[in-house]
Amino acid sequence: MEAQDPLFDLIGLGFGPANLAIAGAIVEKWEGPSAGGDGGISAHKVLFIEKQPEFQWHPGMLLPNTRMQISFLKDLATLRSPQSPLTFLSYLHAEGRLLPFINRGSFTPTRREYFDYLSWAARTVESKGIKVQYGEEVVSIRGSEDNTVEVHSRDVKTGTIVIRRTRNLVISPGGNPKLPPNISLLYPHPRILHSSRYATSVDQLLGTLSPANRPLRIAVIGSGQSAAEVTLDLHSRLSSMPGGDRPHAIDMIFRNGSLKPSDDSPFSNEIFDPDTTEVIYNLPTQSDRENILKEYNNTNYSVVNPRTIDAMYEVMYDQKLDDAIARRKGDKATPSAARITMHPHMTLYFADDLPQLAETDSATETSQEGIRLTLQNVFSQAQSTRDYDAVVCATGYDRTSWLRMLTSSDIGKHFGLNLSSDPVQLVPSTEIPKGPDGSLFDASEEEATWRPASPITPASPSPPSTPTSSALSQSRMLGQLPITKLYITREYCLVPNSPQFKPRIYLQGCTEATHGLSESLLSILGVRAGLVVDDLWKNSQ
């Protein structure tokens, strides 16, 4: 274990786009007209800790020719400060591609170019004094006697634990790959991938399968953008691989009736505007915020860009054309392209590990490990079993790791959290109860409200009450649990129960319940970073 003496003004957990935007806003403060004045965050006392060995951004989904779904103007800084040196236009100018990009006639760069922009921005802020410790994974945070926060991180190569202290903390955990429960029981498995690892793992996966020289069967679970992109990429790859007397098969499995287009029309896109974040945060009830999230769900979740849907339909239409021509000609030649089949209205009922697929290659007598999926129709409840060589899960991300970190830390007690705090509801600080004299109520465990047990999601409001012992017993019998309210400001800062806790802890990318749908997206990075950094400066001595 290694303890580092310097006390940091700010430590950021993670160094993805969210904390990169924070770093950029800090650099602008350092270089701005008020630089060198009282207060603020001291230069060279800012550190970001990142698990990856270098800056990364969704490497598993950097597929060929995939485009961003937002304008390049929604970059790290433009909406906050168009004159910032960290805008996408500044990147293009620095790289000598400004005019060629203009000549493209498109506001949406490729995903590959946007990753290069983010990498350029990371190098730029580091050159201006921001410290980034790559190759370390944060394992815990703890309170310190001097009212600072201890950050414990592990060197991913050596296993050495490093302890650092900070006055303020920004938690930007990103998302952890989420697998269907039945699949997660088998994971890790050499034949199961999450879409977050697809581009970096698919070559190795197909390399282990290709020697079989037989038709491969691969399942893609999900109905969103990642699922569609993975399916199209698999189709392209498998179409060039020999498969014996039948084409390779790709099955898309999803609960919906079809792939649904994302709504990126101008009025709907305003849901991602910073002004809309203000509106959502200040809605009077949690129920109102839930209704807004539900109304605009089709702008972000389980939807596919219309261009991608068109490409998918074109591939499947060509399959029908090939079939018709083959029937007319009586052509029994081996089809050259892989085939995509959709299985709508299906849920995953059961998953099992197959040591060997039933079908073996007659020439080599070899077989491959596989996965057996039992699917269930959501209407008829009818079940069917299918065997696959591999399964790719494009099933989204879990964004609650920050909560587990807090509840397992002694810092959690300052926010009313402990290991038994389940469920937890993130609530705007404007809803903190006030005492009879109008002062803010000292939130504590006594301020629990009651509701049926549910995951960590926005909950319907109920009036604060302290249940009697009989009410507590009855609630437990009915499967109800006390809900712990965790308050957060408009500036993304968690509100402690007591003013005695001085460190400021900010959340990035995980406050959708209070700040709206744009929270986990790139759309408001620059504006959000400005709010956080301004709040840090205002509250720093």
From Swiss-Prot:
Quaternary state and interactors: Homotetramer.
Renumbered residue ranges of the record's region Disordered: 430-474
Molecular function terms from GO: ornithine N5-monooxygenase activity
Amino acids binding FAD: 50-58, 69, 520-522
PANTHER family (UniProt xref): L-ORNITHINE N(5)-MONOOXYGENASE, MONOOXYGENASE
Necessary cofactors: FAD
Induction remarks: Expression is induced under iron-depleted conditions.
Protein name, as recorded: L-ornithine N(5)-monooxygenase
Pathway it works in: Siderophore biosynthesis
Catalytic activity reported: L-ornithine + NADPH + O2 = N(5)-hydroxy-L-ornithine + NADP(+) + H2O; L-ornithine + NADH + O2 = N(5)-hydroxy-L-ornithine + NAD(+) + H2O
Gene name of the record: SMO1
Cofactor, how bound (note): Binds 1 FAD per subunit.
Source superkingdom: Eukaryota
The EC number(s) this enzyme carries: 1.14.13.196
GO biological process assignments: biosynthetic process; intracellular iron ion homeostasis
